């Protein structure tokens, strides 16, 4: 089932509301039942049962409640608002996730927030955007619960608009996607996770261990391994010095330390002494390291350390020490320079380049070993990925300005002739939904 053009919802509650159901044109992948989705385009009290409708039909909502404007749209005025993006997670036992979701829905119903908030029996994982007053109101409300009172919250600028298209509040089996799921992992047992290091401790440890690279270039002789537990394309725009590019494009497929030497010779954990080697793990916000460290712990790795709060927390507290480039983020911004997290590193991070209020910059990389165009291998001038213009590909890739023009915004020559080709985007822009371009072509088509 899919609804369009407004944001949609699919829940398993039965409280009746004044919602009118109307037909709409198909606009993409189907909805999932029992998935709560809120936005500023639908009723703020989503409690209508959808499971009675056939999944072969297309529907959209037109809410007639008093909180709506014309055509059922919410009355949120974003003009002049100071938007931020908020990220946090917590592994904690939640006995009744559905009841917990109801509490969150009740509080969020009147807030202008969009993003992803996942809950289950193991805790919560949230990334969302909104006006600062609304975004922080949710944080303060959550901290009123003893289970979340000391929650570590990451914040960054959101370009004065939402960084997500809608808000999903969902009871999800896995707080992060990993092959085989994570419900069986001992995430609620802190000793089974890596030991968290404060940013200052992490910085000091990296500095103290730098000499090991020169003294022992092979893994077998090192006293530590710096492990980037992200995707390769994230490393391409920024990473800690000394961290090798992860040969993975999706965290769910991460398998460091799980294969023998014959199967994965490029595994950075091959031939390391599991008893004596310090494994220093980092990711964007920390949750992927917490998850994967339990996997490594079960495989016999003893000395596991993680960067508390991830790279975003480190940049805020320590600036760019030992870090090079930008930080990839999983929202419409795609990439942020260190200055977005710490104003004091502007000069050091980007020199004379101009940083706008969103923290964007045409920063030229200082490390020429990364930030390469995926097509011609030249140095890119902007540390930000783009999506392939071919809708059916949509690959994230780094590209220089020349290749953008030559390949019409596509990631390869094969995509240029694709039937659903979107226009070339220049600068920091994101593609709209396909129907925007399709309808535009239909309107501009000559009459016959």
From Swiss-Prot:
Record's keyword terms, sorted: Chloroplast, Plastid, Transit peptide
Catalytic center residues: 283
Domain of life: Eukaryota
GO cellular component: chloroplast
Database matches in SMART domains: RHOD (SM00450)
Keyword Zinc annotated: no
Domain spans labelled Rhodanese: 220-323
Record protein name field: Rhodanese-like domain-containing protein 8, chloroplastic
Interval spanned by the transit peptide: 1-23
Organism this protein belongs to: Arabidopsis thaliana
């Amino acid at each position: 089932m899919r609804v369009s053009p407004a944001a949609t919802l699919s829940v398993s509650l039965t409280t009746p509301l004044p919602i009118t159901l109307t037909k709409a044109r198909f606009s993409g992948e189907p909805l999932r039942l029992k998935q709560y989705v809120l936005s500023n385009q639908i009723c703020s009290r989503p409690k209508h049962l959808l499971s009675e409708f056939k999944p072969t039909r297309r529907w959209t909502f037109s809410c007639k409640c008093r909180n709506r404007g014309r055509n059922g749209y919410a009355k949120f005025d974003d003009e002049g608002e100071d938007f931020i993006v908020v990220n946090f997670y917590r592994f904690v036992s939640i006995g009744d996730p559905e009841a917990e979701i109801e509490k969150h829905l009740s509080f969020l119903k009147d807030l202008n927030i969009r993003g992803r908030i996942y809950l289950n029996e193991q805790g919560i994982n949230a990334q969302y955007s909104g006006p600062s007053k609304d975004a922080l109101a949710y944080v303060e409300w959550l901290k009123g619960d003893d289970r979340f009172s000391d929650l570590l919250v990451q914040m960054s600028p959101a370009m004065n608009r939402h960084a997500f298209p809608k808000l999903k509040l969902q009871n999800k089996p896995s707080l992060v996607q990993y092959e085989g799921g994570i419900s069986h992992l001992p995430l609620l047992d802190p000793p089974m996770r890596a030991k968290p290091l404060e940013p200052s401790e992490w910085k000091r440890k990296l500095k103290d261990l730098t000499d090991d690279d020169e003294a022992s270039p092979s893994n077998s002789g090192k006293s530590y391994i710096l492990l980037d537990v992200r995707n390769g394309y994230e490393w391409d725009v920024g990473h800690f010095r000394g961290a090798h590019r992860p040969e993975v494009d999706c965290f769910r497929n991460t398998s460091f330390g799980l294969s023998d030497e014959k199967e994965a010779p490029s595994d950075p954990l091959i031939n390391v002494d599991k008893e004596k080697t310090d494994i220093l793990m980092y990711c964007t916000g920390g949750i992927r390291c917490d998850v994967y460290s339990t996997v490594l712990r079960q495989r016999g790795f003893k000395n596991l350390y993680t960067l508390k709060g991830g790279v975003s927390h480190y940049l805020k507290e320590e600036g760019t020490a030992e870090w090079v480039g930008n930080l990839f983020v999983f929202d419409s911004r795609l990439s942020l320079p260190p200055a977005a997290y710490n104003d004091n590193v502007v000069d050091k991070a980007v020199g004379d380049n101009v940083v706008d209020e969103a923290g964007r910059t045409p920063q030229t990389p200082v490390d020429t070993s990364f930030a390469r165009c995926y097509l011609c291998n030249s140095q890119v001038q902007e540390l930000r990925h783009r999506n392939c213009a071919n809708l059916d590909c949509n690959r994230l890739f780094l590209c220089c300005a020349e290749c953008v023009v030559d390949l019409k915004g596509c990631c390869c020559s094969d995509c240029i002739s694709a039937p659903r080709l979107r226009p070339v985007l220049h600068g920091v822009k994101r593609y709209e939904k396909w129907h925007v371009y399709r309808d535009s072509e239909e309107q501009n088509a000559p009459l016959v």
